[in-house]
């Protein structure tokens, strides 16, 4: 069993072309990524509204897109692409542990598919509502 961490994209991005891990500029993404690394996972990916499952080293251009504006049908289609990509990169959806460092719109349809069997949602599991509470959780966990 592998441990996989999925960190959601954020709206604040550096302009231009960057490695995916360097594209996202917000304190929330930086802390979530730092926390993801602290978990010593086998793999970390970014859940991107535009690029779907994004490898940290992938070279990508900035964009302005969020799942928050997607219809339910579009989010379901997005999730199906993510699930397909997860399988292609060697993630075992039934056996590997998936940790979502993401809001509900980024994990809801992935989990609803029933394909991911072992998962954690630290933000939801700790009843964190709002960026301030999430940042506090991440900062406390990194102490």
Predicted features and spans:
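Peripheral peptide segments
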Residues: 1-143
